[in-house]
């Protein structure tokens, strides 16, 4: 493979800034008391500080310029088997990427490669879309506290640590986009956030946004045993449903008051952050991602969704195979997890491999998720193989890792398949994606490499070893 044009990650630039700091620190004592009139006769300390700031800005400017230059150079990936998910696999195909998006793909000889393109020989490799996890907790669970069971004003991205090693392990597993959620210990634990694993060192750099710049995400809800405990939390399933009905009724009344006030600030009710989030749910602007296991709990979610008209994705659905027809009639998608190790809890005792196949046959849109740490993100790819073993078709198994999840997050126009105009998020494998022996070689997000198994530091997060599970400042 031709060595790719690698852009140093921000962590490296930070280390360079630190090196500048160290170097200047060592020479600081050599500076005269006054550096000269060019620095306006400032003191040695102030002059030194200004010099350090100037060096830092220069380095960061170069980093930005280099990154932009790399994204402008077309990249042509040739010779691989390309599985676009939307469309038939392409043997010995070519994938052309430029400015972070897919410009062309097709059989060898059918794609015009610009003379300026950087070429990557992927003969013998397999290229698939970037993997999408619809339910993850990496970066620190955070979310609601013990003050009450319903907390729609809580935003998970206010508590995420982007330097958490889970992000490095996720790209090592081929993941390129996530729905990061609060935990499930509440009836409603807060707002989720949809992120791209671009390698940014701030949460703002990871968040996906709409055309108006608003951060995208859903709303996390749960029922069953997780949210049942001492007051003020509910103690029964019936009380859980009653509390949520009351909250949605209040949100509907708040929405109606806002609508009646039009643009008159004097008529508007006092701003209520709790109810604002629920109004977004009622208006369909925020999808509910609902943790639920038992078949009766699943039916309760469908009942509430029908009553209040909110959009919902069912998560886990350990007993979803028992009510697959009911889920299909409600036209509600399911995000499932396949756990092949013992443990868990009693309400998930009927979780089986055949769930995906049964849901597919019933016509239910089905995706997989990790619920990381329940399943390590590095093992996400193998869920397709487990699902196919349990009865899913090969096509549905691959979609469950990619396009199905994108649809559940309303992101399928941007990600989830390899298609002209979509974001250049893809994974390079050394074999069949359904084989448990297949490894992720490289992960690319928006046309930039974010994981390379050939890099010793990346390999550490892919295969384990000393330091792999320790959160470190990159």
Describe the predicted segments one by one.
Residues 68-72:
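Boundary at the C-terminal end of the N-terminal hydrophobic targeting segment
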Residues 73, 82, 86-128:
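Histidine-rich, glycine-flanked metal-binding segment
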Residues 52-64:
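Bacterial N-terminal signal peptides
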Residues 80-83, 419-463:
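C-terminal cap of metal-dependent C-N hydrolases
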Residues 144-160, 201, 218-220, 268, ...:
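Active-site gating loops and adjacent loop-to-helix segments of metal-dependent hydrolytic enzymes
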Residues 166, 171-312, 439, 473:
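Polyanionic/metal-chelating signatures
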Residues 143-145, 149-154, 287, 328, ...:
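His/Asp/Glu-enriched, well-ordered alpha-helical/loop segment
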């Amino acid at each position: 493979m031709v060595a790719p044009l690698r852009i140093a990650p921000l962590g490296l630039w930070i280390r360079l800034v630190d090196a500048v700091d160290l170097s200047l620190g060592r020479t600081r004592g050599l500076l005269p008391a006054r550096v000269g009139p060019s620095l306006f006769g400032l003191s040695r300390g102030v002059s030194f500080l200004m010099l350090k700031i100037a060096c830092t800005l220069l380095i960061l400017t170069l980093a930005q310029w280099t990154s932009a230059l790399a994204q402008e150079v077309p990249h042509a990936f040739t010779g691989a088997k390309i599985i676009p998910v939307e469309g038939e696999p392409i043997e010995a195909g070519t994938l052309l990427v430029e400015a972070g998006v897919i410009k062309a793909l097709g059989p060898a000889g059918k794609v015009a490669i610009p003379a300026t393109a950087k070429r990557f020989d992927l003969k013998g490799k397999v290229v698939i879309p970037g993997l999408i996890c619809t339910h993850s907790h990496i970066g620190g669970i955070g979310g609601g506290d013990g003050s009450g069971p319903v907390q729609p004003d809580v935003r998970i991205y206010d508590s995420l640590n982007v330097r958490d090693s889970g992000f490095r392990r996720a790209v090592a597993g081929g993941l390129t986009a996530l729905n990061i959620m609060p935990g499930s210990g509440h009836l409603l634990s807060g707002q989720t956030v949809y992120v791209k694993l671009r390698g940014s060192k701030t949460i703002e750099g990871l968040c996906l946004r709409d055309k108006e710049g608003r951060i995208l995400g859903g709303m996390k809800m749960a029922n069953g045993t997780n949210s049942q405990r001492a007051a003020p939390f509910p103690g029964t399933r019936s009380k859980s449903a009653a509390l949520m009905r009351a909250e949605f009724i209040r949100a509907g009344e708040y929405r109606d008051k806002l609508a009646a006030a039009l643009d008159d600030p004097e008529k508007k009710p006092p701003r209520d952050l709790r109810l604002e989030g629920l109004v977004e749910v009622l208006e369909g602007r925020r999808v509910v991602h609902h943790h639920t296991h038992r078949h009766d709990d699943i039916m309760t979610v469908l009942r509430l969704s029908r009553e209040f008209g909110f959009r919902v994705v069912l998560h886990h659905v350990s007993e979803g195979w028992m009510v697959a027809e009911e889920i299909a009639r409600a036209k509600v998608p399911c995000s499932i997890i396949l756990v092949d190790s013992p443990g868990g809890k009693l309400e998930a005792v009927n979780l089986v491999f055949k769930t995906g196949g049964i849901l597919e046959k019933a016509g239910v849109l089905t995706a997989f998720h990790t619920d990381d740490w329940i399943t390590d993100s590095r093992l996400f790819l193998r869920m397709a193989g487990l699902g196919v073993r349990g009865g899913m078709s090969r096509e549905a198994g691959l979609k469950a890792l990619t396009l199905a999840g994108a649809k559940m997050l309303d992101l399928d126009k941007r990600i989830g398949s390899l298609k002209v105009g979509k974001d250049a998020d893809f994974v390079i494998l050394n074999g069949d994606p359904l084989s448990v022996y297949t490894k992720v070689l490289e992960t690319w997000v928006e046309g930039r490499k974010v994981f390379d198994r050939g890099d010793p530091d990346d390999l550490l997060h892919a295969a384990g070893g000393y330091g792999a599970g320790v959160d470190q400042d990159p």
